[in-house]
Amino acid sequence: MTLYEELQARGLVAQITDNEIIDLINNGKATFYIGFDCTADSLTAGHFMALTLMKRLQMAGNKPIALIGGGTTMIGDPSGRTDMRKMLTKEDIAHNAACFKKQMEKFIDFSDDKALMLNIADWLLNLNYVELLRDVGACFSVNNMLRAKCYEQRMERGLSFLEFNYMIMQSYDFYYMFQHYGCNMQFGGDDQWSNMLGGTELIRRKLGKDAYAMTITLLTDSQGKKMGKTAGNAVWLDPNKTSPFEFYQYWRNVGDADVMKCIRMLTFLPLEQIDEMSTWKDQRLNEAKEILAYELTSMVHGKEEAEKAQAAARALFGGAAMDTEHMPSTQLTEADLTDGSIGILTLMVKAGLAASNGEARRLVVQGGVLADGEKIAAPTVSFTAEQLKKGVVIKKGKKVYHKVTL
């Protein structure tokens, strides 16, 4: 099976500009890039598709370029949004880019020029605006740009000129890397198709040469919602933002209808094994979820952390003695207490188990909160410093455990 056939079998290919892409990636002749807007100081589970694709392509001899959006992050990509993204400072972007590289190195081999990490800001921030308008802007039709899918949702609410430039700037990135780094291919999410076509067309018009683009399938659940968030919050690759246990549990709790799709698209398990697993039903789906969670946690946090997370999850949910050592936890200080105690509602908010006192109150009233195995009887319950020094295990719903200490 060729690389392209495997990508298709895993359901990763959405669209390609030309069939020449197939020969290029199969023969390890592609120098390709994927862009990352560094709007936070950590990658998320939503970046998994891009990271694993880069790894697959590199393993076949192709050269990845991880392009950090140091310039375009200052604008904000309007694709798939109805609001304007927050713009970041140069200092924010530099910090976020450094965090990204550390996480990407778990997927991509940057040694011996096998891969590159570039920052758009290195060329984009030094552009002369008049020259850009003359040399690049002249190659774009405003009529065609306004028909692009990435601008549709923003037109009714108002599309700023700042955001309107995003397609031109992303196209220029491809054009620049084609000239200076031999980058002949771009990969991205299916929502980036219009922007990617802009880059291939700019290269054709300015240089008379061919460049290629392929979009990858967005990772969505059976309801069509993007995966990578839990309770509205991102699932981070940074263990300080999302612990290895929480990361493991996110994938362990995917829906029955989604587990095999995730295994096929995100893991490196052989397709023959995945095809056999696709016949599993009922309780064996839980086994498949454990495999998914272990594989992805191991990829991000290492095998040791994956094994700890798996053992903790089995202890918590399998009826064995509770493993509190690897449980998500929050350590309070004396300053968090009032007159030597803290109420359950405040405690839940500080532990990230509820977004507000109101939400915490509803959970308690509905009987969905336990402390050390005992149901919280009323929202007025509080915990003393002595109790907290021993550690209090809060259970929210059926699957969320959190240890709070002082």
Residue ranges, per PLM feature:
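Buried hydrophobic packing segments
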Residues: 50-57, 177, 195-203, 296, ...
